[in-house]
Amino acid sequence: MNLVIPEGYQSALDIRETEVAIKMVKDFFEKALAANLNLTRVSAPLFVSPESGLNDNLNGVERPVDFDILEQNGRVAEIVHSLAKWKRHALGRYGFSHGEGLYTDMNAIRRDEETDNVHSLFVDQWDWERIIDKDERNTDTLKDIVSKVYQALQETEDYMAMKYNYIEKSLPQQLTFVTTQELEDQYPDKTPKEREYEAVKEHGAIFLMQIGDKLASGEPHDGRAPDYDDWSLNGDIIVYYPVLDMAFEISSMGIRVDEKALKEQLVKAGCPERENLPFQKEILEKKLPYTIGGGIGQSRICMFFLKKAHIGEVQASIWPEAVLEEAEKKGLNIL
């Protein structure tokens, strides 16, 4: 059973108060993010066709939930894992220009997820994407956009701390930028997750860059699909979360692959045949805009700002019976 309940933990809010606070966090952050990044909200699909190549393959092993469509002679559709590829496609189709972007409320089901305090079968996030020029595909652009996302997080923390006196601010003024290789060099004997913990304990909040490619040790820091992020220009916003004494990932984002990076990464990932899928083909033929984008966990930031011990306190999902029994014993209000 993957459940940790901190000694003496008690939620400051009951279920109804929590629901009100969740809405407050989501409404404020969504507006701040859209303003800081110049984003327009758009509607998004819950499912896509497998042959479109638009679903997010995550680490390449997770099985999507699929179903057949009666009206279309049993044609199969897949519930999205994320909208990483769909968004880039939509930016081109909807007529967005340089410096403009979109965001959407993304709901997904990850049936193969190992659930714990911060992982659920149900994923809800703001998925966003913004158009850049090819010559902006560099670390400076990445850092600039990351800082704007972090600013929206800081503004939300200020707002929630003003509304609820039990909320103590914990985000540092400055976000620290560090690469996965720098962390491996600094902590060669630790696992990737242990390195993240050491870094956030020291800095409070980091943007961990360059995730997906092999490090000097021969192992990648973590898996990333080869056909959306450029592994040399991506990363995660990770913060220290005192309630659970852990490294807490809030957002994964990056500059997206161009035609060169896509070809290289498909070969590295051992799936060069994916370049024949429609979405990947459009990148190789330079038919899609160059973009930067990411996902920001809605339940994750609600957990963080409301100081909750379990993600089930801020979203409705299905949990193992043993987890529900233990949570009830310890007074956790699972939705």
Where are these predicted regions, by residue range?
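Extended, charged alpha-beta segments that form solvent-exposed binding/catalytic grooves
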Residues: G99, T104-E194
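N-terminal pre-domains immediately preceding structured catalytic cores
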Residues: S49-D56, K169-V178, P320
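Class II aminoacyl-tRNA synthetase-like tRNA-binding/catalytic domains
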Residues: M1-H119, D127-I131
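A generic secondary-structure signal for well-formed alpha-helical elements
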Residues: L33-T40, V149-M160, A309
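A translation/RNA-centric and nucleic-acid-associated enzymatic feature enriched
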Residues: I109, T180-L335
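Generic recognition of stable, solvent-exposed alpha-helical segments in well-folded globular domains
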Residues: V20, M24, F28, R137-D144, ...
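Generic structural hydrophobic/aromatic packing signal, biased to beta-strands
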Residues: I22-V25, F29-L33, F67, I79, ...
